[in-house]
Curated annotation (Swiss-Prot):
Annotated protein name in UniProt: Small ribosomal subunit protein uS14
Keywords in alphabetical order: Ribonucleoprotein, Ribosomal protein, RNA-binding, rRNA-binding
Family of this protein: Belongs to the universal ribosomal protein uS14 family.
Organism, scientific name: Rhizorhabdus wittichii (strain DSM 6014 / CCUG 31198 / JCM 15750 / NBRC 105917 / EY 4224 / RW1) (Sphingomonas wittichii)
Listed InterPro entries: Ribosomal_uS14, Ribosomal_uS14_bac/plastid, Ribosomal_uS14_CS
A single GO BP: translation
Gene Ontology MF terms: rRNA binding; structural constituent of ribosome
Disulfide bonds: none
Highest taxon of source: Bacteria
A single GO cellular-component term on record: small ribosomal subunit
Length: 101
């Protein structure tokens, strides 16, 4: 089980990303658009720098829904490999069976 503080920190980051998503996307589009004036792009970059660091989507870490484990994460199931194997063996994940050939 991951430290509760790490899990909570990641949840706070998710909330910040959600709150600033629209503003972040708008400013990023202006800053990356080469057809815009250079000063307008610079202003957008400066405004992007004022947004909190944790509002950047790349700072959010994918974590297991059960344990909060950050590594060996399967996006499709939102679980780490340990929990995926455990729940699949117990038959709690529909459509997942142990491979046999």
């Amino acid at each position: 089980m991951a430290k509760l503080s790490s899990i909570n920190k990641n949840e706070r980051r998710k909330k910040l990303v959600k709150a600033y998503a629209g503003k972040y996307a708008r400013l990023k589009a202006i800053a990356d658009d080469e057809s815009k004036d250079e000063t307008e792009r610079l202003i957008a970059r400066l405004k992007l720098a004022e947004i909190p660091r944790n509002a950047n989507p790349t700072r959010v870490r994918n974590r297991c829904e059960v344990t909060g484990r950050p590594r060996a994460y399967y996006r499709k199931f939102r679980l780490c490999r340990v929990q995926l194997r455990d729940l699949a063996n117990k038959g709690l994940i529909p459509g997942v069976t142990k491979s046999s050939w």
